[in-house]
UniProtKB/Swiss-Prot annotation:
Keywords: Metal-binding, NADP, Oxidoreductase, Potassium
Gene from which the chain derives: guaC
Protein residues bound to NADP(+): 108-131, 216-239
NCBIfam families per UniProt: GMP_reduct_1, PRK05096.1
UniProt-listed Pfam families: IMPDH (PF00478)
Descriptive protein name: GMP reductase
SUPFAM superfamilies for the chain: Inosine monophosphate dehydrogenase (IMPDH)
Length: 347
C-alpha cells in the first residue's frame, strides 16, 4: 500500500484564466482540427467531439444528426450486422466518415466488427469499448485489432494514468480513452472505490500520449460546455460526451410517461438496466456499476450541439485562441472553490 500526496483535480476544481485577445468575434474561432493518426496513418478533419458509445446516446440517428456539425459518433456495439447494413445503405459518405464502430473484446465481438467494417470502406474508426483498460486482455485485443485492420484508426481504453496510456499506444491504439468513473450515470467510484479526478487524468495522459505521437479522448465528467473547454485546455485531443447528449430525439432511450409528462430513460452501460437488456441480467459474481435516470425530453440534439460549440468558441475568445488547436497552450487553470452564482438555480 502507498499514498500519493499529489493533488488531483476535476473540472469543478478549476476555472480558465482569461487572457488578452485580438479576436473581434466568436465567429473568428476555428473549431475544426486536422489530425494524422500514428498507426493508421489516416488523415481526418472535423470538430473533435464524440458522442459516447452508449445505447442511449451513440445511435444511428445521433450519428446522422451530429455529422452535420462535423462531430463524430461512437455507435454502440449492440446493433446487428443487418442493422448496420441498413444504416449504411441509407447514409451518405459524409455521415459514414463521422462514425466509429464500437466493439467489445470477445472473439464474437471481433468477428462481428470484421463483418461490419467489410460492409463499407468509409468506416475508418474502431472504438474498443471496455470499462477497464488495465487488463492484459485489452492490450492483447488492441494488438490483434491493429494487425487485422492496419489502416483503421483505433480508439481504446479506458485508462487514467500515463504508463497504461503508453502501453495501449505501443500496442496499436491511435487514440486512448481516458476516464474511470466520472460519467453522469457511472457508479464505479462508489461501488469499487477506484477512480481518478478527470482533469488530472487528462493532463497526465495527454502528456504521455503526445510523447509517443498518440492522442487521447477525455471520456466522462463533462456537465457543461465549460467542462468541454477545460478538457481541451488540459490537453485532450477529443472529448467524448454521454449525459450532455442524452434525452434527445436521436438518443434512443425508452420513453416513459409519469403524471402526463414524458421522460427518456438514460443509463450507464454497466447498470442493471443495460445488463438486463443485453445479457439477461446482472451476473451473480458482479455488481452493477451504473444507474438509470429519467430525463425530461430535450427535443432535437442540434440545439444542444450548437450550445456546446458556441460555449467552446467563447472560451477560445476569452484566452485569445483563434483555433481550437491553440486552446491548450493558451490555458492557465486557476484553482477555485466555486464555479457559479447559484442563487436562482432552483427557480
Amino acid at each position: 500500500m502507498r499514498i500519493e500526496e499529489d493533488l488531483k483535480l476535476g473540472f469543478k476544481d478549476v476555472l480558465i484564466r482569461p487572457k488578452r485577445s485580438t479576436l473581434k468575434s466568436r465567429s473568428d474561432v476555428e473549431l475544426e482540427r486536422q489530425f494524422t493518426f500514428k498507426h493508421s496513418d489516416q488523415s481526418w478533419s472535423g470538430v473533435p467531439i464524440i458522442a459516447a458509445n452508449m445505447d442511449t446516446v451513440g445511435t444511428f440517428s445521433m450519428a446522422s444528426a451530429l455529422a452535420s456539425f462535423d462531430i463524430l459518433t461512437a455507435v454502440h456495439k449492440h446493433y446487428s450486422v443487418e442493422e448496420w447494413q441498413a444504416f449504411i445503405n441509407n447514409s451518405s459518405a459524409d455521415v459514414l466518415k463521422h462514425v466509429m464502430v464500437s466493439t467489445g473484446t470477445s472473439d464474437a465481438d471481433f468477428e462481428k466488427t470484421k463483418q461490419i467494417l467489410d460492409l463499407n470502406p468509409a468506416l475508418n474508426f474502431v472504438c474498443i469499448d471496455v470499462a477497464n483498460g488495465y487488463s492484459e486482455h485489452v492490450v492483447q485485443f488492441v494488438a490483434k485489432a491493429r494487425e487485422a485492420w492496419p489502416t483503421k484508426t483505433i480508439c481504446a481504453g479506458n485508462v487514467v494514468t500515463g504508463e497504461m496510456c503508453e502501453e495501449l499506444i505501443l500496442s496499436g491504439a491511435d487514440i486512448v480513452k481516458v476516464g474511470i468513473g466520472p460519467g453522469s450515470v457511472c457508479t464505479t467510484r462508489v461501488k469499487t472505490g477506484v477512480g481518478y479526478p478527470q482533469l488530472s487524468a487528462v493532463i497526465e495522459c495527454a502528456d504521455a500520449a503526445h510523447g509517443l505521437g498518440g492522442m487521447i479522448v477525455s471520456d466522462g465528467g463533462c456537465t457543461t460546455p465549460g467542462d468541454v473547454a477545460k478538457a481541451f485546455g488540459g490537453g485532450a485531443d477529443f472529448v467524448m460526451l454521454g449525459g450532455m447528449l442524452a434525452g434527445h430525439e436521436e438518443s434512443g432511450g425508452r420513453i416513459v410517461e409519469e403524471n402526463g409528462e414524458k421522460f427518456m430513460l438514460f443509463y450507464g452501460m454497466s447498470s442493471e438496466s443495460a445488463m438486463k437488456r443485453h445479457v439477461g441480467g446482472v451476473a451473480e459474481y458482479r455488481a452493477a456499476e451504473g444507474k438509470t435516470v429519467k430525463l425530461p425530453l430535450r427535443g432535437p440534439v442540434e440545439n444542444t450541439a450548437r450550445d456546446i460549440l458556441g460555449g467552446l468558441r467563447s472560451a477560445c475568445t476569452y484566452v485569445g485562441a483563434s483555433r481550437l488547436k491553440e486552446l491548450t497552450k493558451r490555458t492557465t487553470f486557476i484553482r477555485v472553490q466555486e464555479q457559479e452564482n447559484r442563487i436562482f438555480n432552483n427557480l
